[in-house]
Amino acid sequence: SYPNVFKFGKKILMIPETAKNKRVEIWICEKFPKKWKLHKTIFKNESWVDLNFFIDRKGNKWLFGNKSVDKYSDHNSELYIYKVVDNNFNKLIPHEKNPVIIDSRIARNAGKIFYNKKGEIMRPSQINIYEKYGHGLNLNKITKLTIKDYQETIVKKIQVGKNLRLKGIHHFSMGEKNIYIDKLFKF
């Protein structure tokens, strides 16, 4: 899992991995990159991983995340979306179709949601199959994002296979000039 660091107005916020604490913590940066202060706690008594904060072109704010709803701590199978109504995360409206995805091959986030060069919204997701975490990545194009509807299509897959030296891969982040991927190689 990854900490989601993002700008929110003039603030820099971070959502670190806190699934074991059964809550989601939002931290505010006091002095980048080393000084942070707890700003808000949401989703108390729930186990979440890989939360993404995203602002669409219309200014709507969204949280995308993966929640475990069973005793086995499965965070791979379901994607949930919430609309963030205010600037303090006090009011979160659940998407009407939550969970919007139920499928371990595409549900779990694998990095920040971003706009590609064509202006399309892209959501990296993990391929978790064959009882293998990090089997591969998808790049999904979000084609519909409203409080009532959500649709995405896979446009690219990067999978562990015989022809690749990859043993595992589960994170993709698009920077301003670089792409960052974590991977485990076979030697």
Per-region residue spans from a language model:
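Carbohydrate-active catalytic/glycan-binding domains of CAZyme proteins
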Residues: 1-187
